[in-house]
Amino acid sequence: MTDLTAAAQRALSLMDLTTLNDNDTDEKVTALCHQAKSLAGNTAAICIYPRFIPLARKVLREQGTPEIRIATVTNFPHGHDDIDIALAETQAAIAYGADEVDVVFPYRALMASNEQVGFEMVKACKVACAEADVLLKVIIETGELKEASLIRKASEISINAGADFIKTSTGKVPVNATLASAEIMMKVIHEMGVGETVGFKPAGGVRTAEEAAQYLALADHIMGDKWVDARHFRFGASSLLGNLLNTLGHQGQKQSSHY
């Protein structure tokens, strides 16, 4: 097994296979569930809009992969600063049966020097998730924050408020995951000493096995080569799957989405 095929195999098992499009349908979500089960192994999770969760749960169970987790999104994609709405959406996602919730941090508020609303939003969502044993990922939207100091601050606030994961991006803005932002975020996890409990998720723009391998190498370098597993690292992606399967010698159905 070459280094690239090893990285591809690793990346496949860490994927949150995603469809978050306005034109998503029951048929598209069903197809996504089928794709999450491949000849090369299963993805860690799928990530879909909340209304599709009951359908996905049924499809995953019927195809014999109930262990594939279901993630969804709240306060998405704009990251507004209304805590009550973000919390209500998160509670609704939990009621739909989500295993994981990816909530968008109110990043514009932070850019306007309001640190408190982000802390309070993440904390409120964490309380709701913890009661239901649901994992909370916080999307800080690095491509909009841009500045290293803001990316660092959003990461710190999210972790201090109880995030189980910090995630780069919604995939809905011009700049999504980058190695530079990934380095900042993982260094925060490392420097805060929370690597046991807090994971990292690059999302959007990771489309090839080569790109995935770069993120995995960076994680191994910063966090140590025993850290990366599905509890501590995920890729948010859709088109990546087809490339990974090709790299592994399996011609898979490719996603049309460009997340």
UniProtKB/Swiss-Prot annotation:
Keyword hit for Kinase: no
Keyword terms, alphabetized: Cytoplasm, Lyase, Schiff base
InterPro entries to which the protein is assigned, alphabetical: Aldolase_TIM, DeoC, DeoC/FbaB/LacD_aldolase, DeoC_typeII
Localization per Swiss-Prot or TrEMBL: Cytoplasm
Gene Ontology cellular-component terms listed: cytoplasm
Entries under SMART domains matching the protein: DeoC
Plastid listed as a keyword: no
Reactions this protein catalyses: 2-deoxy-D-ribose 5-phosphate = D-glyceraldehyde 3-phosphate + acetaldehyde
Main subcellular localisation: cytoplasm
Similarity comment: family membership: Belongs to the DeoC/FbaB aldolase family. DeoC type 2 subfamily.
Protein name: Deoxyribose-phosphate aldolase
Organism: Photorhabdus laumondii subsp. laumondii (strain DSM 15139 / CIP 105565 / TT01)
Source species taxonomy: Bacteria, Pseudomonadati, Pseudomonadota, Gammaproteobacteria, Enterobacterales
Gene: deoC
